[in-house]
């Protein structure tokens, strides 16, 4: 056991039994790094992060790796939801040096906390090779790492001066955005698709044009009908691993859901529609159902259960075939878009096709929920984050106004 056993954070407690001598971020431990002249390994993640859990199991439980880290580094673990300020600093570093980032965010710092390297997920052998190289460089030629860090800081300062002097303006011109947006599947062009609620909010309030309206409709359609939405329990997953929005990365984050409730509600309010009321209602009901005893909304729901990533959400093809009748199976195939892109290893991930037969809907949904009820529900991180709860309160108010539901307000 290490000192993380005393952590309030569920994410940090997951690492309490690691053989690594993980420390909290504190003035005392940072002073120790300077006194002992040791590099710092800073590892940042959060409770719902699938790859954080994988690296914890594969890499941070490894005795050989732990011994090397304990002897040669100061090892610090951070929950990004507890220290968004620190996470922001080192996420900026990886974005500036590599162009992309994510979690787990694993950094190597000089004893004075200046970064010299940042990466994300590493298998055990790759991680050991990486930290061994940096240990050797720092031992034999520390000036090389110090110079690199100094150059990065100078570059960052110059970049900030440029940003302050530039007069960039947000443009509503479709032509200027066209190279960044996906006209085939909606959203921002990327191999992975994030809902990007702030971008959606920006689009909603743009002057109406046929091109923008068509793009917004396509984006909202795929966000509410494809794999990023959970049509049984309600709620949105964090992102999809493919550009077509078919298969999600299965954690649910409060801040995403809160903002998407606002986006969909405001879209309907502006357009004088009730197009997304069922999605909004189901999502609100889901988050209310898992609200903590102290009346706060939890920060996230894990991607994993005992069956692995998305284990709670996947439906085995043979199990569905036994539970549903032939007619129910035919209906489910249409209603939940059960086709080849959503089938992996004889397991379905269901979508939210708005094709609904009232007579069959309740029966089929109830049976599918029963299948889920026999699985362990993913871990809920009951950490109450004030700003995210405020986002949800805003979402409830927006929904209440848009759909004239006083219970939400």
Predicted regions mapped to residue ranges:
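Replace the tail clause
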Residues: 1-402
